């Protein structure tokens, strides 16, 4: 496996393997990881979801309490979906990672090497930036709460152990909330940066295809082949990129779509909380921090998926810029068919096939969340 290709997923795999999401070869490790996965999903994920649901149901008549819980509940629902989705498709994900190192996706020549190296560096920086940002947001939510007012739990959840501040039961629930939120943070870092890295890889392949299209007809040599041979080779390469894009979409669209839906709930609840709880400085600080992190999370997913679509839109122009007027009739006919196919742009679609992940979707999410917030505030007043 090429070390360059591993940059797109190796760090994220290691991060997610803390939660035992990947298949194991040895029987002993399979048993250990299965036990750890059941422990994580039942105790740290589903139980946490249940406590949040019970708290919301017990406080339906108190809008402020519902809002304080709903933004964490929606986040937890999104990260639960990600965990279950990765575990259910872990074998297919492993096959996808191996496929990235196929000969057909490897760069040829200095220009392509530079494009691939830039994509690797971009993926690494994104992973590190997003991880640092997420841990910083987690720290800003938990540490000020403990330092300034540890008499209140970090999160609003159902408390079956009583409200006796300072008791062992209280600190047990306090630590449980902190660790459960950390599990959610780890999942989001691994999954979101993995999705973005795969989108960067797809965009990198489209950039390489554009370079190869530009070279068609320029080097008619024994090694370079005729124009017709070069066209056929690029058509096959484009077909492999399309197949890879469909595989990525099939594996990722469901959890990302659920994340988008949950994000609308989170943003709406946070808009409302920021407007209503402006007098409670510590609570306001937590909501503003979380709101910023959530917006960046959605932006990253939509932006890098949108880059794939945007680069795909440029490919017909790249083919048209070649010296096709000097080619023979058969080559021009193949080029015309190829150009017609290139007009079918690549899109990473949501569960609704009419929508793709792009900046337009990001704008719609923010506008929709603010509209729901305005409606909620009007109804509540």
UniProtKB/Swiss-Prot annotation:
Keyword Transmembrane helix: yes
GO MF annotation list: odorant binding; olfactory receptor activity
PANTHER family: ODORANT RECEPTOR, ODORANT RECEPTOR 46A, ISOFORM B-RELATED
Protein's membrane topology: Multi-pass membrane protein
Protein's recorded name: Odorant receptor 46a, isoform A
Residue ranges crossing the lipid bilayer per the database entry: 38-58, 66-86, 128-148, 171-191, 256-276, 288-308, 356-376
Miscellaneous note of the record: The atypical heteromeric and topological design of the odorant receptors appears to be an insect-specific solution for odor recognition, making the OR/Orco complex an attractive target for the development of highly selective insect repellents to disrupt olfactory-mediated host-seeking behaviors of insect disease vectors. Odor-evoked OR currents are independent of known G-protein-coupled second messenger pathways.
């Amino acid at each position: 496996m090429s070390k360059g290709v591993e940059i797109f997923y190796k760090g994220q795999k290691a991060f997610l393997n803390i939660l035992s999401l990947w298949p194991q070869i040895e029987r002993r490790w399979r048993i250990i990881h299965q036990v750890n996965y059941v422990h994580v999903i039942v105790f740290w994920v589903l139980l946490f979801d249940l406590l949040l649901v019970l708290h919301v149901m017990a406080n339906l008549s108190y809008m402020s309490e519902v809002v304080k819980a709903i933004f964490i509940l929606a986040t937890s629902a999104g990260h639960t979906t990600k965990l279950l989705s990765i575990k259910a498709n872990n074998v297919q994900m492993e096959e996808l990672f191996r496929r990235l190192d196929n000969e057909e996706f490897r760069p040829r020549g200095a220009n392509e090497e530079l494009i691939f190296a830039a994509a690797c560096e971009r993926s690494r920086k994104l992973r590190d930036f997003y991880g640092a940002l997420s841990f910083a947001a987690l720290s800003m939510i938990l540490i000020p709460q403990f330092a300034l007012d540890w008499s209140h739990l970090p999160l609003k959840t159902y408390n079956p152990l009583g409200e006796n501040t300072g008791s062992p039961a209280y600190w047990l629930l306090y630590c449980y909330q902190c660790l459960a939120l950390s599990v959610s943070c780890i999942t989001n870092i691994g999954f979101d940066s993995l999705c973005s890295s795969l989108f960067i890889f797809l965009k990198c392949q489209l950039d390489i295809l554009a370079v190869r299209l530009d070279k068609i007809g320029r080097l008619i040599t024994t090694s370079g082949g005729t124009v017709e041979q070069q066209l056929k080779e690029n058509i096959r390469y484009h077909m492999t990129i399309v197949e890879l894009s469909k595989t990525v979409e099939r594996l990722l669209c469901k959890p990302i779509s659920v994340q988008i839906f949950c994000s609308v709930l989170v943003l709406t609840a946070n808009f409302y909380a920021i407007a209503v709880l402006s007098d409670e400085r510590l609570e306001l600080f937590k909501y503003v921090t979380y709101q910023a992190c959530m917006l960046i999370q959605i932006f990253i997913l939509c932006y890098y998926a949108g880059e794939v679509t945007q680069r795909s839109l440029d490919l017909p122009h790249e083919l048209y810029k070649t010296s096709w007027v000097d080619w023979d009739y058969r080559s021009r006919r193949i080029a015309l068919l190829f150009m017609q196919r290139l007009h079918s742009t690549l899109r990473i679609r949501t569960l609704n096939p009419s929508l793709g992940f792009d900046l337009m979707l990001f704008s719609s999410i923010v506008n929709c969340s603010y509209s729901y917030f305005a409606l909620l505030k009007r109804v509540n007043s």
